[in-house]
Amino acid sequence: MSEFNITETYLRFLEEDTEMTMPIAAIEALVTLLRIKTPETAAEMINTIKSSTEELIKSIPNSVSLRAGCDIFMRFVLRNLHLYGDWENCKQHLIENGQLFVSRAKKSRNKIAEIGVDFIADDDIILVHGYSRAVFSLLNHAANKFIRFRCVVTESRPSKQGNQLYTLLEQKGIPVTLIVDSAVGAVIDKVDKVFVGAEGVAESGGIINLVGTYSVGVLAHNARKPFYVVTESHKFVRMFPLSSDDLPMAGPPLDFTRRTDDLEDALRGPTIDYTAQEYITALITDLGVLTPSAVSEELIKMWYD
């Protein structure tokens, strides 16, 4: 048997299921690790999970989201180790319940859509930054409920995620227009609310997300427009950044080294940023509608209850 590679396993799960989020793929990979590695003691299991988690985080750029999944799985393991006297039963329990957790987490978007649909009214114009599966699930659910609304989608450079969301909304028959990121300030007074997803939700209630989210949050705040974060609770992560400078980045936010004459290839910069809690109206999650200050309470429940 070839040596187990946590990174390759993680990437394979993402490739096989395009709807899977990074935290869930991380948990799936760690469950697979336990099944293959078969540690002989609790201490060996914890060390194996820790070392594999560190390896995975180091190997994946923008690892905030998968870090949340690794944290959740470690918490799950630590809380369940003492429940069984028999080690073999303990291992089997962790594997089976890890898979059960993954199954439930995959359904969280449906729950978010059911909760969040009350935030969309007839004739709303909704600004969306980037492509979030949770946001799309909510918008699709609202359209299926025959709520008449329109969407303004940012292009979301450099990833151009907005193009993907624009195409999906068009296919669903939802009226939508695509704008460049720099046009948000020009249209913010014409929209009714803003929806964004999240790569991770920090302990403070602020969010780590696609670059440009912070700019949209500031503009929405100044224009007194509601700014809603639509996200799964398994993206709550034990981090407390004060600004985007505190985020784990693949490279420096500003790089003046010239590497190419192609302007498109020369386009560089951060891929994620941090939006502080004061710009966020509420978080629409599978746990319900939360204020930013409630996130730390939920993390405490997750880790210490």
UniProtKB/Swiss-Prot annotation:
Spell out which residues are annotated as carrying N-acetylserine. S2
Which family does this protein fall into?
A: Belongs to the eIF-2B alpha/beta/delta subunits family.
Q: Where does the record place it? A: Cytoplasm, Cytosol
Please classify the protein's predominant subcellular localization into one broad category: cytoplasm
Q: Which residues carry this modification: Phosphothreonine?
A: T291
Tell me one GO molecular function of this protein. Answer: translation initiation factor activity
Q: Could you describe the subunit structure of this protein? A: Component of the translation initiation factor 2B (eIF2B) complex which is a heterodecamer of two sets of five different subunits: alpha, beta, gamma, delta and epsilon. Subunits alpha, beta and delta comprise a regulatory subcomplex and subunits epsilon and gamma comprise a catalytic subcomplex. Within the complex, the hexameric regulatory complex resides at the center, with the two heterodimeric catalytic subcomplexes bound on opposite sides.
PANTHER family tied to this protein: TRANSLATION INITIATION FACTOR EIF-2B SUBUNIT ALPHA
Entry's InterPro entries? Answer: eIF2B_alpha/beta/delta (IPR051501), elF-2B_alpha_N (IPR042528), IF-2B-related (IPR000649), IF_2B-like_C (IPR042529), NagB/RpiA_transferase-like (IPR037171)
Q: Does the keyword tRNA-binding apply?
A: no
- Biological process GO terms, please? cytoplasmic translational initiation; positive regulation of cellular response to amino acid starvation; positive regulation of cellular response to heat; positive regulation of translational initiation; regulation of translational initiation; translational initiation
Q: Name one Pfam family in it.
A: IF-2B
Listed A to Z, the keywords are:
Acetylation, Activator, Cytoplasm, Initiation factor, Phosphoprotein, Protein biosynthesis, Repressor, Translation regulation
> What if the gene is knocked out?
Inhibits GCN4 derepression in glucose, amino acid, or purine-starved cells.
This chain's function reads: Acts as a component of the translation initiation factor 2B (eIF2B) complex, which catalyzes the exchange of GDP for GTP on the eukaryotic initiation factor 2 (eIF2) complex gamma subunit. Its guanine nucleotide exchange factor activity is repressed when bound to eIF2 complex phosphorylated on the alpha subunit, thereby limiting the amount of methionyl-initiator methionine tRNA available to the ribosome and consequently global translation is repressed.
Name this protein carries in UniProt: Translation initiation factor eIF2B subunit alpha
Q: What else is known?
A: Present with 8970 molecules/cell in log phase SD medium.
Q: Which GO terms describe its cellular component?
A: cytosol; eukaryotic translation initiation factor 2B complex; guanyl-nucleotide exchange factor complex
